[in-house]
């Protein structure tokens, strides 16, 4: 409905109100103008005389009411006519939009069919070249999966990837980008260093906003992530142009040859930061930011993005088997490399120099137990259904406060807990959530570390209390006890179900069970499940023993070999 149409309707309603309040005489009511306005509102496309006849009849009815002094009936009729006009205008607007949407869908469908036919013809005629890949995006390849067979999709994907590999092999300079949304997900530092050490490579970290949560949360996270990488000396580019409110194109930042992805949830990236809008000339590699454990196997293995990655370097052989089982394209593009983030646990390094653990002045520092508290974001109705933070968050704070001489704590909240706790009403605002974190930071024996690497925190700790999902697998690399806080909504994938069998567990709302874990298992060193954890680790997680090298080197060498083979 246009402003002019809305103004016309409001004018008729005002006339009715003025007549009712005797601010306007009924005989001064502009009946002919109102009748004409109703005629235009009805405006039946296929029967103009009918709309004119109906409006004239209503006009005659109002004249009759005026002539007989029927003020209440006249006002009611004017209001009814205004409401009818509003309905007709809104119906027309809806139909016009629907018609426009259908027309756009038809045009998009025609264009999609053209793109599909074009890439299939290029493949069959063996004419896939660099120019074609520069001109098209991964939306075109996604159409092959949608409209063609899985086998055709695999064949054309392989052709696209081989064309890219040959181009990369010819280049003197290879451009490598790491695509991140949050420093807490950063797991590829060793891979970054391997490429950065090569004179024939240009390496950059690209940061994009991830549209989950409030605007404040989205852009606070985005700006903090850029600051994190910049301050640590990484070559860093923000993809969001705040002056024009848009996402920069990949050409603007130098057209990378290979992009490493850490997060597969492509629908939360907009514009050119969505993989569907990446040019086909980019070779996409996915290294999961966390260990896939919970039960959403579709989200973990069968999003459209999973099918558009050249290679997925997964955590374990079990995860490769799950890809075969749950993905539309099987394990076609999946390689079991081991989990890059865990490489540092295989290196003999001195104790971290970072000042992680705060100690109360009167604490016996030699005997203080260092405990990580890692709450997940999915409290209450949150999608994953793992979070228990809302049940015990104040009890955990008070317990840390009351045991200041015996314990030291790091609160490591999930990156999305800020958004999740506000969305679920636990805190009324981001500021209130931040005030809670400040309470922890003010304790003499606690510190909040929201982002950045956490391997050194794991190494220097004694135990963890958590419902954060990926940490359930990752903390096994330090061979220390952890308490998993459960709830009825917990679901696990194939790997997670086996993992859950060898964990200390307590109901997420049972604070007394949490205290017993700290006092008995941690302080008294009664870790009676150690052997079960070690057996699980050897069977599933010891990738260094299986591959004979760190995961970062395995990935680096795999990609290098693939490039060299096509020369």
Q: PLM features: what roles do these ranges have?
A:
Residues 64-67, 103, 174-348:
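Active-site and donor-binding regions of nucleotide-sugar-utilizing enzymes
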Residues 13, 79, 84, 88-91, ...:
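C-terminal amphipathic helix plus adjacent low-complexity
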Residues 187, 191, 196-197, 340-435, ...:
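Conserved catalytic-core segment of nucleotide-activated headgroup transferases in glycan assembly
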Residues 241-243, 424-470:
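Donor nucleotide-activated moiety binding/catalytic core segment of transferases
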Residues 285, 449-493:
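A donor-sugar binding/catalytic signature common to diverse glycosyltransferases
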Residues 2-38, 42:
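Short terminal alpha-helical segments
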Residues 20-32, 46-52, 66-75, 90-99, ...:
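Charged, low-complexity interaction regions
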